[in-house]
Amino acid sequence: MSTRSLTIFILAHVWLLMATTSIAQFVIDTSGEPVEDDEEYFIRPAITGNGGGSTLVTGNGPCPLHVGLDNTEGTLGVAVKFTPFAPQHDDDDVRLNRDLRVTFLTSTSCGQSTDWRLGEKDATSGRRLIVTGRDNGAGSQGNFFRIVQTQTGGTYNIQWCPTEACPSCKVQCGTVGVIRENGKNLLALDGDALPVVFQKE
């Protein structure tokens, strides 16, 4: 093989590797397209038997509302949008492993934000619940989640690990899963992870 052919061969493989790596940095929806921060999506369990899409669920009182899954299998739930902590001014694709806000696109009688937020520990399981509302603490790190790739292509986990929103904070990161309590499917950290997919509205 000539030096020129070898150079072209190597450059072609480097380009292919860079293109594959670049695509892998983005969250992909159920249609195979990158998830965008200015679009609406439904978050659905990737595995049947976990309930329907993500939705607002009442807890012990009317407010704050919890983040959960619809009890009816196959339902879409409530649409969300994603707002990156550090948006890329040149594109609107949602990136893997980057802090972002998740916001339900609906109004509530609670008169509060529908941003996902890390809540208190569940009294029974000790797992940290996901609720809605603004975190009024310094840096609002309770409102920042991230999407991470699972080992199965096209499925993802959602984690609370706000290392961009608060790089100096010492936090106990956790992956979102489900607690079944009083006939409700509540999202919480610190247990079995819930693999999800993102379906564009």
Curated annotation (Swiss-Prot):
Q: Which GO terms describe its molecular function?
A: serine-type endopeptidase inhibitor activity
Q: Name one GO cellular component term.
A: apoplast
What is the predominant subcellular site recorded for this chain? secreted
Q: Which SUPFAM superfamilies does the entry link to?
A: STI-like
Q: What subcellular compartments does it reside in? A: Secreted; Secreted, Extracellular space, Apoplast
GO biological process terms held by the UniProt record: arbuscular mycorrhizal association; response to symbiotic fungus
Signal peptide span:
1-24
Site (Important in determining the strength and specificity of the interaction with its subsrate) residue list:
170
The reply on keyword Disulfide bond is yes
Quick one: effect of changing residue 170 to E?
A: Enables interaction with SCP1
Against InterPro entries, the record matches this protein to: Kunitz_inhibitor_STI-like_sf (IPR011065), Prot_inh_Kunz-lg (IPR002160)
Q: What causes induction of this gene?
A: Accumulates in roots during colonization by arbuscular mycorrhizal (AM) fungi (e.g. Rhizophagus irregularis and Glomus intraradices).
Q: Which SMART domains match?
A: STI (SM00452)
Note the SS bond partners. 63-110, 161-173, 166-169
What are the record keywords, sorted?
Apoplast, Disulfide bond, Protease inhibitor, Secreted, Serine protease inhibitor, Signal
Biological role stated in the UniProt entry: Protease inhibitor involved in the control of mycorrhiza establishment and arbuscule development during root colonization by arbuscular mycorrhizal (AM) fungi (e.g. Rhizophagus irregularis).
By sequence similarity, the record places it as follows: Belongs to the protease inhibitor I3 (leguminous Kunitz-type inhibitor) family.
* Quaternary structure note: Interacts with CP.
What is this protein's record name? Answer: Kunitz type trypsin inhibitor 104
